[in-house]
Each structure stands twice: as structure tokens, then as C-alpha cells.
């Protein structure tokens, strides 16, 4: 396989149009079409479906796209590694963060430390759901992601970071420092969608106790959730880091769910299909050192060994 053809193919799939891809790649469309035809001949498979609206990958094309992104990324990392021997690390490092994770507390320390220690490295931070972040890792669009993990994901390597207890957060009728799950079942709740690790843990706990949650709304945005809780319409369940942040913003209270005790594991995820670039590895070490500090936002969290 020719690396240039793979690069062309990935760009076509990313854009979804041969014409636009040809413009971006500065190559004539007939020549680009010939490169695709040659690649399809090498694979002995049709890779693209051409329609009036553009092009979409076939099943074989989707498989090649995934592998091609990994191959191109590894080639880029290899070149960077060679170029950086004896030189200052430089380049971009992309990190995904799940909303409401403890990692949010180290965002500014991370940016400041990288700026001080790796001045030529640009950190790109993206916030999204855990499922979306894993998909981006597999697609080669992120170097690493910090999220609450529910179960192993094929193609993903997870490094446990710490555990956080779950807290009930609200602004009306504070139950005290701790609360029983039966009391939570009587409250109106705002929770994330069912693919969220928090939602899955809450659902599991309610099912085991044969209780039903009174969910009055599903909210993904922390900003919207803060406004909803501040209004007094209902309460929510969050890991300690997110609970403390929302509690302060909404001028509310937080109570640890103690019967039963509930927690979530925070993990650093990376793709198993390739190694990190030198600059990404350096940023990873900084991130791990920050998360491993005894206190985040002046609170003790349970580190995972």
C-alpha cells in the first residue's frame, strides 16, 4: 500500500466529497479518482460508494479507514520521534475529558505546567461523553482521554487513576451529610442519558434495591444542569469532584449516598493500536503527576493502585 493513497483515502472519507477533497489536497479530481481506483484494485474491494450527495465508505472502506488513520498517525509519530531526538519536544497533544470528571480540576494546572515545561507543545482539550471519547481514541482523533469507565472496551487501554464516591446534589430540603438510596428514590432527579457511567451506576443501584428513580429530565450540559438544580426543580447524582463544583455554582448542598455506598473509577484511556508520540507521552506523565497529588480542590480522593 502507498501511504499517499491512504492519506488521500482518509481525506476523502473525512470530507465526504471527492471534489472537495481534491481541492483540499491540491490534486485534480480525475487523478484523485484514479488513486482511489488503484487502491480498490490493491484491496480487491470497493471502498467508496459514490452518490449525487458525495461519497461514503463501504463496510470494507470503513475497516480500511480505521487502519489507515492508525498507520498514518504512527508514521507521523515516528517522524516526530526521529526529528525530536536531542531537540525540544513540540507539536499538538489532544486530550478528551468527560464532563464532571475530577480531571476538570487539573485543567488549568495541566495547561500551566505544560506551558512551563513544554513550551513548544500545544494542548488541545475536548469535552464529550465517555462513549464519544473512546470512539475518537479508536479513530485516532485523540491521544488520550480521562473518563469514568464502566467496562473494558475493545481496542482501548485503560489506566486506573482514582475512585470517587457519588453524591446527591440539590438546593431544597437538605437531607444532611449522607443520604439513603430510598430517600433518593423519593426525589425528582435530573440525570445524564443511559450511556453515561453515572447513569449506569445509579440504575444498577436502584435495580438491586428494587427501587425506581423519579427521573424528570436528562441533561448532558453541566451549565444547564447547574441552572436546573439552582431552580429547585430537582436534584442530581454526581461524582464528588463534579458535585463540589456544581454545589458551589448552584449555591446548593451535597450529601454522600451512603446506603449503599456508590463510587466510580476514573481512568486514563488510550488507543491500543499505536504508541503515544514523544510529546503526548510527556504530557501524559504531567497529567498523571497532577491527578496523583494527595488533594484535588482541597479534598481527598481514593487513588487506584
Swiss-Prot record:
**What Pfam family is a match for this entry?**
LysR_substrate
What is a biological process (GO) this protein takes part in?
regulation of DNA-templated transcription initiation
Task: Tell me which residues make up the HTH lysR-type domain.
Answer: 1-58
Q: Which GO terms fall under molecular function for this chain's record?
A: DNA binding; DNA-binding transcription factor activity
Which Gene3D superfamilies does the annotation name?
3.40.190.290, Winged helix-like DNA-binding domain superfamily/Winged helix DNA-binding domain
Q: Which residues form a coiled coil?
A: none
Q: Which domain of life is it from?
A: Bacteria
Cited InterPro entries = LysR_subst-bd, Tscrpt_reg_HTH_LysR, WH-like_DNA-bd_sf, WH_DNA-bd_sf
DNA-binding region coordinates? 18-37
Q: Which SUPFAM superfamilies match?
A: Periplasmic binding protein-like II, Winged helix' DNA-binding domain
Query: Does the UniProt entry include the keyword Kinase?
Result: no
Q: Which UniProt keywords apply?
A: Activator, DNA-binding, Nitrate assimilation, Repressor, Transcription, Transcription regulation
- List the NCBIfam families hit by this protein, alphabetically: PRK11233.1 (NF008410)
Which family is it part of?
Belongs to the LysR transcriptional regulatory family.
Q: What does this protein do?
A: Transcriptional activator for the hut, put and ure operons and repressor for the gdh and gltB operons in response to nitrogen limitation. Negative regulator of its own expression.
Protein name in UniProt:
Nitrogen assimilation regulatory protein nac
